[in-house]
Amino acid sequence: HAKYIGIWWEMHIGISTWATGKLHAATTQNTKKYIDFAAQHGFDGVLVEGWNTGWDGDWVKEGGLFNFTEACPDFNLPELSAYAKSKGVYIIGHHETAGFIDNYERQMQDAFQQMETYGIKAVKTGYVEHGSILNNGKYHHGQAYIDHFRKVIQLAAQHKIAVVAHEPIKDTGERRTFPNMVSREGARGQEYNAWSADGGNPPDHETVLPFTRGLSGPMDFTPGVFDISIPEKPDNQVNTTLAKQLALYVTIY
């Protein structure tokens, strides 16, 4: 299984942002640093969140503004794609929809074609929402979303792109037909350690997941956080040890 690192955790702990501006994380310069690290330490891919336009403002409520082919002005996709390839690494795309699936479906063909053109072999999709009914009045696990997920993985397969879905629907065996549906989240993830009011996931959280969530199929949990303390968030920390973070690469896949 491929391992990847990415530009995401630094936003959750508050040292950078998805939105554009002085603290924007997904810049050409910062992404090159991650690519260099990945190449040096044997990681296959580099996930980049916040690379595209639409993150400024209240994106959870305004997800219809996301553009999945237009990069932010300080993110040079062609340059970074070529740079990653020269280092033996590939960029992993990020398509956060905030649950606005109609907006995503209108752009998917162009978005996946762009990814294939630039050698982006995988995409992390996202459907962040608050509550079971989304802004478009549809249920997260309703038929509209079931149909949508099938469209995504089918179109991605045509462009030879692997899908890792966050805020997904339940795994029901689609990956037997579409093996590019590599993994999905579907559990309380690592990011809760950065900002949850209850202080983060309890130490036994990851011991339970393989025997509960893991029963339905592969799980994307984003392990590998070694800076356990979070100076920017004194009431939070990653409730773990370094050995445990490494072990999660084996016990959760």
Q: Where on the chain are the PLM-derived regions?
A:
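Conserved structural scaffold segments of CAZyme catalytic domains across common CAZy folds
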Residues: 1-87, 95
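Aromatic- and carboxylate-enriched substrate-binding clefts and catalytic-loop regions
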Residues: 50-231
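Alpha-helix initiation and N-capping motif
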Residues: 2, 175, 218, 244-245
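Glycine-rich, aromatic-lined ligand/substrate-binding cores of catalytic
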Residues: 229-253
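Generic structural signal for residues positioned in beta-strands
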Residues: 4-6, 220, 250
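Low-complexity, polar-biased intrinsically disordered regions enriched in Pro/Ser/Thr/Gly
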Residues: 14-26, 137-139, 230-238
